[in-house]
Design a protein with these regions (language model features):
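Intrinsically disordered, low-complexity terminal regions
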Residues: 1-65, 135, 159, 164-257
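Extracellular/lumenal glycan-associated surfaces
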Residues: 72-80, 92-93, 111, 130-131, ...
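Active-site-adjacent structural elements in folded domains
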Residues: 119
Length: 257
């Protein structure tokens, strides 16, 4: 008989490349003279040593920093990041004191990311879980192709926010640009300010008491919008008229939504 596991061995619930860290162990990295690759290697090395709180000084807008972290971690960037920062993560809590470029936290699975200032386009592209928060404004195509999780924007959001989103929720406390929710399959977008225009198959829906309760709780946890009136929010959902699947594609339909 073929044996696929040994019941006497300890179970391992970690990814390969994920580490057990102690949040009370703290260290700092000065990134001023480091390439993005060397900095990521240092972060990984410190996690292997069990450090659970890592502060990165002088990130200087470098690209692809803090990517691929698959375990719990307190990660603080004192400054701004470039493109594709904090991508493909599953678990860490990240705080960035500056701003971020395009595609921050793309393909995020779990955790919490907080941006103190503004974010570029494609913020939270294809995220699947966790909370992604920007206290400032975000660029175009925020939440494009998102499949879960929550994106919270303290300022305004650019054009085509929520484009082709399939699940999850987006909260925008400010205004939204043109074509909000264009071609969305599912999910919900909440807008506190003005909507320049709705995209294809995006429609307004009735805000329920359950929605308002959830918004209050989420904003409180996110430490943003403490005086925001959730009762004035506009709720946007998919009209589902683009669900044009024929009888030969039941599996494709199930996989898409």
């Amino acid at each position: 008989q073929q044996v696929f596991f040994n019941p006497e061995e300890a179970e391992n619930f970690f990814y390969y490349g994920a580490y057990d860290v102690d949040f009370n162990k703290r260290t700092e990295i000065d990134a001023k003279d480091l390439t993005c690759n060397k900095l990521n290697e240092k972060i990984n090395s410190f996690m292997q040593e069990g450090y659970g709180t890592i502060v990165v000084k002088n990130p200087q807008g470098k690209h692809s920093l803090g990517v691929g972290i698959l375990n719990k971690l307190n990660l603080i960037f004192e400054g701004s990041l470039g493109y594709f920062g904090i991508g493909c993560i599953d678990g860490p809590v990240v705080r960035i004191t500056g701003r971020v470029g395009w595609s921050c936290a793309e393909n995020m699975m779990a955790g919490k990311v907080l941006i103190e200032k503004n974010a570029g386009s494609c913020f939270g592209a294809a995220i699947r879980g966790g909370d992604l928060i920007c206290k400032g404004s975000v660029g175009a195509r925020t939440g494009i192709d998102m499949k879960g999780g929550t994106i919270i924007v303290g300022g305004d959001a650019g054009a085509f926010t929520g484009f082709m989103m399939q699940r999850g929720r987006i909260i925008i406390l400010g205004d939204a640009g043109i074509n909000l929710g264009d071609s969305m399959y599912d999910g919900t977008i909440f807008v506190g300010g003005k909507i320049k225009s709705l995209g294809s198959d995006a429609i307004q829906s009735k805000l329920t008491p359950q929605d308002m309760d959830w918004l209050r709780r989420k904003l409180k946890v996110a430490e943003i919008g403490s005086d925001f009136d959730v009762s004035k929010v506009t709720k946007v959902v998919a009209g589902k008229k683009l669900w044009n699947y024929d009888q030969l594609e039941p599996t494709e339909k199930k996989g898409a939504i």
